[in-house]
């Protein structure tokens, strides 16, 4: 991987797709120390900001980018190009958290327009992924057993590298 341009790096045996910023004017300067970096520990997430040592518990909807360096950066209000400083990214979207738990995430980014087929590049759990179109339809608000048929079909056809996770509560 070292020495290759990001578009030639390999993720899970495939070539990574890098998404350019389609709206350079949206890459406005912002306070960089206000942008969060996401970390996870099992199914709990924490945010770190700038040089602070404090951890924050995410508890709202955030705009995120996955940089070509592998960091997931987020902010509740800044736009994707501002967070990424206009640079190309591995993925961009929105993520909703509830007291440190990821509820859902999507490819909702009009400036990068990442496709669902490369959603695994975001580094977030695929079982909580919804396409932007599904979010607009409100399908992300349904119980997890009612995954949209369009996404289920893609998973079954192997278009998205999704691992099945065992169900909790004895399979109910």
Locations of regions flagged by a protein language model:
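Eukaryotic phosphoinositide-binding membrane-targeting regions
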Residues: 2-171
